[in-house]
Structure formats: C-alpha cells, structure tokens
UniProtKB/Swiss-Prot annotation:
Its EC number is 3.4.24.-. It comes from Mus musculus (Mouse). Residues 684-826 are cytoplasmic. This is Disintegrin and metalloproteinase domain-containing protein 8. The chain crosses the membrane at residues 659-683. The gene is Adam8. Keywords: Disulfide bond, EGF-like domain, Glycoprotein, Hydrolase, Membrane, Metal-binding, Metalloprotease, Protease, Signal, Transmembrane, Transmembrane helix, Zinc. One of its GO terms (biological process) is lymphocyte chemotaxis. It is a single-pass type I membrane protein.
Amino acid sequence: MLGLWLLSVLWTPAVAPGPPLPHVKQYEVVWPRRLAASRSRRALPSHWGQYPESLSYALGTSGHVFTLHLRKNRDLLGSSYTETYSAANGSEVTEQLQEQDHCLYQGHVEGYEGSAASISTCAGLRGFFRVGSTVHLIEPLDADEEGQHAMYQAKHLQQKAGTCGVKDTNLNDLGPRALEIYRAQPRNWLIPRETRYVELYVVADSQEFQKLGSREAVRQRVLEVVNHVDKLYQELSFRVVLVGLEIWNKDKFYISRYANVTLENFLSWREQNLQGQHPHDNVQLITGVDFIGSTVGLAKVSALCSRHSGAVNQDHSKNSIGVASTMAHELGHNLGMSHDEDIPGCYCPEPREGGGCIMTESIGSKFPRIFSRCSKIDLESFVTKPQTGCLTNVPDVNRFVGGPVCGNLFVEHGEQCDCGTPQDCQNPCCNATTCQLVKGAECASGTCCHECKVKPAGEVCRLSKDKCDLEEFCDGRKPTCPEDAFQQNGTPCPGGYCFDGSCPTLAQQCRDLWGPGARVAADSCYTFSIPPGCNGRMYSGRINRCGALYCEGGQKPLERSFCTFSSNHGVCHALGTGSNIDTFELVLQGTKCEEGKVCMDGSCQDLRVYRSENCSAKCNNHGVCNHKRECHCHKGWAPPNCVQRLADVSDEQAASTSLPVSVVVVLVILVAAMVIVAGIVIYRKAPRQIQRRSVAPKPISGLSNPLFYTRDSSLPAKNRPPDPSETVSTNQPPRPIVKPKRPPPAPPGAVSSSPLPVPVYAPKIPNQFRPDPPTKPLPELKPKQVKPTFAPPTPPVKPGTGGTVPGATQGAGEPKVALKVPIQKR
C-alpha cells in the first residue's frame, strides 16, 4: 500500500498534453512502470524470445494507480497454426511457424474483484482493462513500453455506431422467439459443462491490408482481436484458439459493401478452397470495406460445425477492441445466440450506457463485456445438439505454441489440474500454484467429479436430449463423462428415423427455414425439378422427396432468394441457398422418404443402407447399439456386451486392485518374520562366536599346539591361539591338547609352583579321537622373554582329564591365577 501511495504521489499525469487523437475525444497521458517480478514457476527458457511469461505494470492516472498483473496467453495459437500471404512475385506462401513467440497477455487488476485485462506489449502497451463497470483503453504514443501512452475510457472513443445485420426472421434454427425467456431450460442445464473449444481461422482482406500498411501490422491486429475474444468467452467455459490466418493483398472473391453478399461469397469460398484443407471449426473475415448503412457484421445463426460456420466483420474502430467486440457478437450467432432485443423480458445486468451485453443488436461508444442470461440459455440449448461435436474436440494441449504453462486453464503434460491463476482460481480441489491436486483429492473438474472425488459408476453424467440420443453414465474411474453417444442410424423416432443423433423430417426442415407456420408441400410438388435461376420447372413423373425441399406457408425470409410455382394441389416454395437462386435447399440426408426408406445421396434408399440390422442382438437385452455399432448398456450394466452388472464389475475391479496390496502385505509379514528369526539365531549364536574367538581351537595335529606359534602368526583369527592378553572364557570345560614332551616354563615367583587340583567331571566324557603324534621330533622349545608387566602364559592341561582354564582378564602387571572350573553336567 505504501508503494502504491508513493507511486500516486510521484505520478501526476497531465490531461491530454500530447498530440490530438482523431478517434478519441479526450485522454490522459500516462507513463507505465514495469514492476520487478520473480520468474514464473514454469516460465519458458530465454530462447523463447523477449516476452516473459508474466508481467506487472503500474499505471498512474489522475486519482488512481492501477496495478496490472498479466500472463502470456500461451493458448492463443494452436499447434497447427499457419499464416498464408502473397509473396512479392505474387505467389502464395503458407508457413507453419514453429516456436512462435507473441506479446499478447491476459490478466486482472490488483485489488479489484472480477476485473479483467487484455493487453499487447509488442510496441508499448495496447489493449483494455476493466474495473467494475468501467472499461479503460490504453495505446502507445511512442513505441516504448514505459513511454507516453494515451489512456481513456471507452465512452470517449469516437467510432461508427454499428449494428449487426442479423435479423430475427433469419433465426431459422431457433424457432419462434416470443416469450422464449420463459421456456423450460434444457434438462441438463444443472449438469456442469466441460470446456469447449472453437478452432478459429481468420482471413484479412486486401482493404484491411492496405489500411494497416504491412503484413506484420495485420498479424498483430488479428492476434489482439482473437486474444480479446478468447477472454470474453472464457466466462462461458469456451476457449477460442487461432489455428490459421490468411492475409490478402489481392482478394480471392468479390467483397461487396452489402454484408449479406460478402457473407455468401465468403462461405462459398470457404467451402471450395478451405474446407478439408486446414482443420478448423469457424472462419471469420475481417474487412476494411465500409458496409452499407450501420451494419458492421453478419453471421449465420446456429451454424457452427457446419458448412455455414462463419461471419464477416468490418474493422470499424481505430482500437482493436472494437472489431473484437463485433467478432465476439457474430461468433455468438454462430453458436446459436440471438439478439437480446429479440427476446421479450431478456435481462442484461449491464446498462446500455455502460456498454450493455455482447449480444445487443447495436454497438455504441462503449464496448460490451458480458453475456446476458438469454445468451447463456441459447448457447446451452445449441451445444446440446448432436451436430456440435466439433466443439468438444480438445486441441492437442501438448503441442500448443509455447508449451505447457500452469494457469492457462488447460490441463497439460505434468499437470493434474489447471484452474487458472491463483487470483482467479476458485476450485478447492486444485492448487493453482502447482497445478496439482490438493491432498486427498481424486479430481478437480469434470461432470463425474463431485467434491474432489470421482463419482461412482452408474451415475448419469449426460441426459438424453431426445429419442435419438443416449444418456451417458460415469464409469467410476475417470472424472470426465464418456463420449457423447446416440442411437444407431435407422432407429425409429417421431416421424422418421434417427440419423447421426437427430431425427430429420420434411416437416421440421420446413419449419426451420420458413417459420413455425410452414408445412410440407403437396406430393405433386415433389414430381418437379427446378433448373438454376428458377427458369421454369421440369416434370419428372415420379415423386422424389430426396431432391429440392418444397414447403408452403410460413414467412418469406429476408435476404434469401426463393422460387415459387403452383401445382395441382397447392403452392410450392423452394428456398435458395444464398442471395441468388442458382442452388436450392435440399432435403437433408437421413430424412424419411417412404416407410422403411431414407434419403441418401439424393435418392430414396432402403434402411439397409445403414447396415445396422441385428446390431443390438449382441447387447444381451441390457443395451442398444449406438452410432459406432457398439453396445451402449442400460443403467447398471457394464460394457462391452452388457452381460455383467456394474456392481459385480466394481467388486472384481476392487478385488483385482486389492490383490497386489494383499500380496505386498504378506511379503512384508514374511520378511519381518525372517528378520526376527534371523535376529534370534544371531543373538543365540553370538556368545558362542565370542567364545570361539576367545579360546584355543580344537587341534587337528601337533602342529596346532599354541606354543608353536609366535605372536606374529599369520593364521586366520578363527584358527589363531588366544593372545595372553585376551580374555578367556571360564564357562566351558577345557579342551584336550597334545601333551608336550618338555615341561612348561617355571611360573614367576609370585605364583605357587604346585598346581591347583583340577576337578574331574562326574559324567563320562564322550569318546574323542586323539590325534596322531607327530612323526618328527619336535624342536626344542625356548621360553619366551616376557616383560615384567605381562603375565606368563598359562601351562597346558593334560588331555582327557580336564584341566585348568586361564583366569579372567588380567590387568597390566597382574599375575594370572588358575581358577577352578565349575562342574557341568552333560
């Protein structure tokens, strides 16, 4: 706090002393100060470039000092990120950049709960940060990160008042909008959703290139835009990852000032040139062309994961946050969101004066920053559709540009969880500093994770949405719900047959395209075909319900061409696929055309085309076949063939997992017992080993007589006679030795010359084999010269009669005294 106070005292920024900015009404000049910070725990090595993993800046304004804590958005660029541009000779170049560094950061403002920041640091600081309901923008006045910067609120930004070109009548896939806010929420609304991902491909046209002046400037602009869009969608558990960028200095299709024409041309170009060439989920055009009227963007509704997944965006603001807000809005349409104004009773917690919500129809001087509750309900309804599977494809997190980083909300190599930065993390199961589970936790996220524990097997984690969907159950081992599965193709459903998780019918397709009052046209309409341009009609003589889709009633869609003609039984309407009528909407694949038949490749074919007959027979009446022709077991039964109950499988798994533990326990007990037994044996043998080392060994020949060895004998210790200075045991009977032919040396005068009587054992000593006498005469024994301070050697005892045993240990200068050996019974 003292540091911040000092900064506020030292910094007294002047108001608008710099050069005038044509796009800003008023601003303050600030000098950001980069704060010293310790290197991130998992910061990348220096070869990754000049932009560190985390940064902190202090921004002093009139009356406030804001401290921004930023972390590099390492997930901004996907592993397959490419850039395509035109070379000087006109040839097209595509580069897949490796170890691509960038300067895009996200973060928060210290001391402000719920704050957010999206900043570029390439040439000074450029971006925004939000404190409460106020959005602050910052841009450099020179290229120094600590030089002069213009800082202003969003309300002071001068820009074109923009609107979205999407009209309510174009919300074909969403049905009627009236009172939708009161409709029942999806059944799985309360089930936590896992993170979904939009792999984004961006195209910048020639007008945008000319406007910004260089390829690098366009690239930096696009990265700033996507970085901001990603930040906005994190609120909805979505991540936006840029996988491709094209920069044109010459347009590849006609870009009209009419947004709808440009959108149709753009999507046609995508289908012909981009689809299948570079994997992506959504494509966005950023154009420098000024669209007619107030329109700044247009998109297809509920089109993500389809061939219509895309939008066009006019770069209408000097600040990149402007076009980013437009792109976030149009991407919302692709994700099934409608305008907040089109839903009666829709509530946005942010007032319009403060920017409103992202899906408001018009963009004012303040940029929106949150989604309304209506948008969240629309999104939840859209993602439950089976055709949105592309959103669940997790990008290869181990190949993100920049490598794994703790705190980016992606669980990467070496991490058990990732709940964001320590300031943002609200997950009690995850340590945000280490990205490891807290002690005692089994999981931190996932629909099969509850209070840090994996849910038991058999609990529902994803409800079925309709007759063509299947509910999924937790397996008791993983915190994530199994892959979304649905009924096998050809399963009967209301009015038709299931196909890829949906139940396509002619009636539903007419309502989707022409509104709730539409219905299927008479059969006579389906006996005609329409040539391109709706120039007449051709009678085929037979009914074909698998060609062009003919409807009647409903509302005529705006900005869509259509063809109308009369038949014997009514009016036939055919809807064009775009603003022209060269092609028409066709009946969808899998639509029921006759009893037991479906549309496939433009013709009415038997259900056997699905090759799914008798598939469920292998599921033992406890499950059905899914779209992968695998058994999807009923609740309580275990895959793969639904023969065993989950409880039995769990018991077997528990037994199999406990078997190694029991084996280890038994081994530990056995080892412990062996150690104890070995200890007892060693303990009992220890005195004997000491005694053996203390007494003379049993002689095997006359040469073993200890008197024949000098003190420097090289015999091993266990065969060497006892040293006179060693302690000799008195607890064992004397062992017989060979009787020497010469008398022992005379003892010192202090000791009596008459030997002490030696007791005889009462029991008979066992027969012992006497060693043979030496074959050669023994050498003359010379007595050793002993210093007065040492005791003389003990005289030997006759074998077989028992004898004296040397006394206890003698001290220096103390004579040895023969002791009586205690009588022991054998």
